A protein has these predicted regions:
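The conserved acidic donor/metal-binding loop of glycosyltransferases
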Residues: 2-6
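Catalytic core of nucleotide-sugar-dependent glycosyltransferases
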Residues: 123-146
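Active-site donor/metal-binding and catalytic loop motifs
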Residues: 106-126
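Short beta-strand-to-loop element that shapes/binds the nucleotide-sugar donor at the catalytic cleft/hinge
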Residues: 26-42
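Conserved donor-nucleotide/metal-binding helix-loop-beta segment in metal-dependent transferases, i.e.
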Residues: 10-28
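A conserved hydrophobic position in a structured secondary element of the catalytic/binding core
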Residues: 7, 70, 75, 108
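Donor nucleotide-sugar recognition loop
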Residues: 65, 77-96, 100, 105-107, ...
Length: 146
């Protein structure tokens, strides 16, 4: 659980309850203070209306490590020595590895956590307020390699 995330007292227990054979990762969807899905799960915004009330769904989409459980099965199957040391973030890489290894990644829509994007890295908020400045810093200072 990242520092910019607020969880409920039962969040992690609910996530652990989803772990079964063949599951690589379990993530809690992130929401803003109004309860709207936010970064990095914008892609799931319309899902709750199409899923007939399902609270947890299997997806091949990328996960963030905002509030994500990596299962023992994934930890044993993945070779973390292969991670590129020049990168800053590995959540996208590892979530893709999980799928590539034949594991299922579960996104819990019914177990949301409050997320304040980039609270620990204020310069990243420039992406939304001053995108040109953000990308200039990202590329010239070689920041935020995914």
């Amino acid at each position: 659980v990242e520092s910019e995330v607020i969880v409920q007292s039962d969040t992690l227990n609910k996530m652990q309850a989803e772990v079964q054979a063949g599951v690589g990762m379990v993530a809690a969807v992130t929401v803003d203070e109004q309860g709207t899905y936010n970064f990095p799960y914008h892609y799931a915004r319309g899902w709750r209306y199409r899923l007939c009330g399902q609270k947890t769904i299997a997806t091949k989409k990328r996960f963030s490590f905002c509030c994500t459980l990596l299962t023992n099965e994934l930890l044993h199957k993945a070779d973390f020595q292969l991670l590129d040391p020049t990168k800053n973030w590995y959540d996208v890489t590892i979530s893709h590895w999980s799928v590539h290894l034949g594991l299922i990644n579960l996104l819990m829509l019914g177990n949301p956590v409050l997320h304040f994007p980039h609270a620990s890295r204020p310069w990243k908020r420039l992406k939304y307020t001053h995108p040109l400045r953000y990308y200039w810093r990202k590329f010239t200072q070689k920041l935020d390699k995914i």
